């Protein structure tokens, strides 16, 4: 079976389906997210990542922003919704919910890697703000965990400001701008 976004939605555990449905109402900061809702953002990210043929990436795409509505606050400076801690909340959802873990496995992915990609997807976008020593240490840690390459693909797919190009991931990295 070839994975598709709709297949993943249709086979998702009820908790994931409910969160996805609720995310159709969350409009994020338009200068970073021109898409109409977080649900649409997730759909775009998943469709980009499905091109890689890597189920870990497809499942991380489905789950990386799944808890945004649970963590949403209005940013005091710009007035747009922000969701601090949504990465940790997604990690917790995966690691603490057996039916989510089973769904990940049923789709050929590794729940530990999917959880780690979700946990670190925001930190990945902050690499450019780190001192070189700290950045290299973080990359080494992710390499040892077997997720560094996956984070690069995920980071590129998660960037809505440029077209996703699997053959030129660097152009998508926010920390290169």
What are these regions (language model features)?
Residues 48-167:
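Divalent metal-dependent catalytic cores for phosphoryl transfer on phosphate-bearing substrates
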Residues 1-74, 78-79:
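Acidic/His-rich, divalent-metal-binding segments that scaffold phosphate/diphosphate chemistry
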Residues 3-7, 15, 19-22, 113, ...:
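Exposed alpha-helical structural elements
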Residues 169-176:
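A cross-taxonomic marker for long C-terminal extensions/tails that follow the last structured domain
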